[in-house]
């Protein structure tokens, strides 16, 4: 995808008031349920828990209670992404690049866990936006073919959507 002003295109997309269809929301809810299942299943094994927590958060058997002890949104995102990725192999197959939806949902968990004023609808919308941005970028360009890590699209999509939920001005959001 050769596109000038991609930052403006993405920020304009994120500032539009889009009402997602029931089909979009259902697909996102199913993706979220799959993610929760992956997290729970991975938490029953010692290796993924040790890796996800870096051995710092004890032996709590409920993976969703562990995050009470994690202070950073980034660490919460890492924790959930690792546990999900342990079982999630749902890479995209239509794009020129593969992607891991679990990484986007991990970021959403990290952001929304620390922003209790947000609601489930905003959480689901953020996941859809992350998927759409990442998917559109991956449809046109393969970073791996150019020698870059495909995770850049994950980070870009997750980062810009998280920033879009802040109270910063549009020019400030674009500069972040």
Task: Annotate the PLM regions.
Residues 1-168, 173:
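N-terminal core-entry segment
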């Amino acid at each position: 995808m050769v596109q000038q002003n991609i930052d403006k295109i993405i920020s304009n997309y994120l500032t539009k008031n889009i009402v997602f269809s029931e089909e979009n929301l259902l697909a996102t809810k199913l993706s979220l349920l799959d993610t929760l299942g992956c997290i729970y299943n991975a938490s029953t094994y010692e290796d993924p828990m040790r890796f996800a927590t870096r051995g710092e958060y004890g032996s709590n058997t409920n993976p969703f209670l562990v995050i009470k002890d994690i202070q950073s949104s980034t660490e919460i995102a890492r924790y959930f992404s690792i546990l999900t990725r342990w079982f999630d192999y749902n890479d995209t197959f239509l794009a020129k690049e593969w992607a891991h939806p679990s990484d986007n949902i991990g970021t959403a968990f990290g952001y929304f866990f620390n922003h209790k004023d947000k609601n489930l609808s905003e959480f689901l919308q953020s996941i859809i936006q992350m998927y759409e941005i990442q998917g559109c970028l991956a449809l046109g360009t393969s970073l791996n073919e150019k020698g870059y890590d495909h995770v850049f699209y994950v980070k870009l999509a997750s980062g810009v959507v998280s920033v879009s939920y802040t109270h910063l001005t549009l020019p400030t959001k674009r500069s972040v």
